[in-house]
């Protein structure tokens, strides 16, 4: 009994001793886990704080960037809106090339290199060596027997030159207020008097255009406002329909509003004075110019344009004047004329070019000066303006986008004063056909045949045949 009691008593004691022995270990283990857990929590809290700090910095940077963008947009909104530039027309520079130019100034360089190869034959005599008519068609220079011609057919004369190559420079500016200003300059190498064909074929630079503009105003040298350059058909020749075309460049002041333009242009009077030898009966005509005009030539033009083409009407009123104190010549007259013409787009492959002009005292404007504006009658000391009727028509047909042809007819007739006699030009006319091939953009290769006739007052005629090849690279 006592033994069983002792045994029973020992079991709780053993259990108590066991608990007492392992309790510190258990407590120690719990404390270590808690510390490790606390350390991990602390590390997590540190990382969270770092993320919070980083997020705050990024938010600050984003806010600053948004502020900067807003400021830039505000500045851009205050600047003038730049004009939309068509594809392929982007400027080569962003900043101004010319240091002295106003901000926003653009510079454009252009022109072409043109080489011409001509074979010419005339029926009634030779064109003089280095004559202008050897390089381009001048209908007034076509020889006629008794009027600058021998009456004998010439041999074929061959000429080659590159003097019609040209270079131009355009400068344009639009101010913050929207005002437009700029200038244009163009030259070629048609200075015949400064060169020859002996060794280097050096020719002088000649001025074609030199003008400035400001909004609706233009001042300087360019095409006459009386002329419609846009209606000219394509030709290998320098002009093409020379016989019947208005073709003048001169200094002027011009105002343009929409399709209307008015200009005051440089005056110049061309004269012919006829004399008859009382013994032989032979007539001679002496050409001269007079820049004694007191009034500028007044020109007006109105034009329309659309998908159908272009059409315009023009007028000129001018003073014809001679004033030479040495000879005692002192006379003046009023001359004037009208013109209309344009370009009719007949379809995707065909275009019709046309012009008709008429008046008295406007011969200087027609055909590169086929004859004079007026006759000067020495005996009466008076001017008798020359009447003129001129025109041309040209048809253009495109076989393909790279191959095209032109057929052109031009003519002008003159009503001359009787004091000039029978040797003055009565009419000129020509017909030409050409073909052009464009193997790649800006490159043109062409061939052209031309036949022209000049008739004088007594009915005699002389003709000219010309075959011309041309190459051109535009830039």
Predicted regions and their residues:
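Solvent-exposed, glycine/polar-rich loop segments of beta-barrel outer-membrane systems
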Residues: 125-146, 282, 325-329, 367-376
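Outer-membrane beta-barrel "beta-signal"
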Residues: 437, 463-475
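N-terminal periplasmic/intermembrane-space "pro-region" immediately following the signal or transit peptide
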Residues: 28-128
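Gram-negative bacterial Sec-dependent N-terminal signal peptides
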Residues: 2-28
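Sequence/structural signature of outer-membrane beta-barrel proteins
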Residues: 120, 190-195, 224-228, 233-239, ...
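Detector for outer-membrane/organellar transmembrane beta-barrel domains
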Residues: 306-425
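Outer membrane beta-barrel
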Residues: 95-135, 139-273, 292-305, 310, ...
């Amino acid at each position: 009994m006592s033994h069983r009691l002792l045994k029973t008593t020992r079991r709780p004691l053993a259990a108590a001793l066991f608990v007492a022995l392992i309790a510190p270990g258990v407590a120690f283990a719990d404390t270590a886990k808690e510390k490790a857990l606390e350390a991990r929590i602390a590390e997590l809290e540190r990382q969270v704080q770092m993320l919070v700090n980083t997020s705050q910095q990024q938010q600050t940077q984003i806010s600053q960037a948004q502020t900067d963008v807003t400021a830039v947009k505000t500045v851009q909104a205050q600047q003038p809106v730049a004009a939309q530039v068509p594809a392929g027309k982007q400027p080569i520079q962003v900043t101004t090339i010319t240091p002295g130019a106003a901000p926003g100034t653009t510079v454009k360089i252009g022109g072409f290199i043109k080489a011409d190869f001509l074979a010419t034959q005339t029926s009634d005599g030779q064109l003089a060596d280095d004559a202008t008519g050897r390089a381009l068609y001048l209908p007034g220079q076509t020889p006629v027997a008794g009027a600058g011609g021998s009456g004998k057919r010439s041999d074929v004369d061959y000429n080659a030159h590159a003097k019609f190559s040209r270079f131009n420079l355009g400068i344009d500016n639009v101010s913050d207020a929207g005002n437009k200003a700029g200038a244009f300059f163009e030259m070629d190498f048609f200075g015949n008097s400064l060169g020859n064909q002996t060794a280097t074929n050096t020719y002088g630079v000649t001025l074609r255009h030199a003008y400035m503009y400001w909004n609706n105003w233009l001042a300087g040298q360019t095409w006459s406002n009386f002329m419609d350059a846009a209606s000219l058909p394509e030709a290998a020749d320098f002009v093409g329909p020379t016989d019947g075309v208005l073709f003048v460049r001169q200094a002027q002041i011009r105002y343009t509003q929409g399709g209307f333009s008015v200009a005051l242009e440089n005056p110049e009077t061309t004269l012919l004075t006829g004399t008859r030898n009382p013994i032989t009966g032979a007539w001679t005509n002496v050409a001269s110019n007079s820049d004694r005009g007191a009034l500028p030539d007044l020109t007006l033009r109105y034009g329309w344009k659309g998908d159908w083409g272009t059409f315009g009407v023009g007028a000129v009123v001018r003073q014809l004047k001679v004033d030479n104190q040495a000879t005692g010549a002192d006379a003046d007259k009023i001359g004037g004329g009208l013109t209309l013409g344009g370009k009719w787009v007949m379809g995707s492959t065909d275009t019709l070019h046309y012009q008709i002009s008429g008046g008295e005292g406007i011969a200087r404007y027609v055909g590169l000066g086929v004859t004079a504006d007026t006759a000067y009658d020495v005996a009466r000391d008076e001017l008798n303006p020359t009447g003129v009727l001129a025109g041309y028509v040209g048809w253009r047909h495109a076989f393909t986008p790279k191959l095209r042809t032109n057929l052109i007819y031009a003519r002008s007739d003159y009503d001359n004063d009787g004091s000039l006699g029978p040797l003055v030009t009565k009419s000129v006319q020509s017909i030409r056909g050409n073909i052009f091939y464009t193997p790649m953009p800006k490159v043109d290769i062409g061939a052209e045949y031309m036949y022209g006739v000049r008739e004088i007052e007594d009915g005699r005629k002389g003709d000219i045949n010309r075959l011309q090849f041309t190459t051109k690279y535009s830039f």
